[in-house]
Amino acid sequence: MWFWIVCGLLLGGLVFMFAYTYPIARYVYFTQLVRTEPEKWDRACSAPENEEQLAMWNAGVEWAEQNRDKVTEVKIENDGFELYGEYFDFGADRCVIVLPGRCECLMYSYYFAPPYKEAGFNVLVIDTRCHGKSSGKYNTIGVKESSDVIAWSKLLHERFGNREVWYHGICIGTAAGIFAITDKKCPEYVKGFVTEGCFVSFRETFKRHMIQQKRPLFPVLDLVMLLINRYTGTNVYKDKPINAIKKIKKDARVLFLYGEHDVFSIPEKSRQLFGACSAEDKKLVWFDKGGHSHLRINNTEKYDREIVEFFKR
């Protein structure tokens, strides 16, 4: 009898816990990972209250205006989505696609373009699906966005004649790039990527976001991961950058840029991702200033120099 009483109490506790935490998980999921209205994740600074973020935005917009005569607006369709971008033609035969982080549009990506212009690249900035002018509602953590990245790569080669395509990813943007370059459908002319602050797994980095926001982790974190799977089909437990990067082709070239004080892609995990990368030509660079995705604003000269010198080799 006591056995059934204990089982009943445990079951009741689980039901109560689920009833209490599931609405929290839904709120977190739809707030952080779903474009619930067209104005969300639009072409606007995602955090104007953040001094560094606003400075990056303004500097990027200024750079784009200075190079406005070089830009062509582009659009593709992939996986049922209309996707928009801007192609800056500097007369080179290779191009970098800047892959922004979560909540960011193509205008955010302007900020990362200057070292590539200096290194002899054309530059493509894009509104990832469900951001900016691009259609879509659900963020798939880079997994399905990777097919969009491949489609953009083909446009650069077939329409604009770029001999090589490279990726520059910031946070979740790198995840899309890693999933793309390790996909069997990825063209041979995609040669490698530069990453700033990529995570080993989305669950790992999102856990740190939730801790910072003082949200309950158990069982909310894993309920959010299950909601991702329910609405997008993405299996966060399997589809991880640290798994995919082990399959990258040996002749790819990869530059890892990480901050010593990044609280979301922490140094310990960053070293694991670098170690797992199967590319023979890879380099890891550390920066002692700047938080997550804010390395260039705090180390502009070094950041740009590392990129330019990487492509001189």
Locate the predicted segments by residue:
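Conserved alpha/beta-hydrolase
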Residues: 113-135
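Short beta-strand/loop motif that positions the catalytic acidic residue
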Residues: 248-251, 256-258, 262
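Hydrolase active-site cap/lid region
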Residues: 179-236
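An N-terminal hydrophobic leader/cap segment in hydrolases
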Residues: 8-76
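Conserved alpha/beta-hydrolase "acid-adjacent" motif
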Residues: 237, 263-269
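Catalytic nucleophile-loop/oxyanion-hole region of alpha/beta-hydrolase
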Residues: 131-160, 164
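Acidic catalytic loop of the alpha/beta-hydrolase fold
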Residues: 260-265, 293-294
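Catalytic histidine-centered segment of alpha/beta-hydrolase-like enzymes
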Residues: 290-301
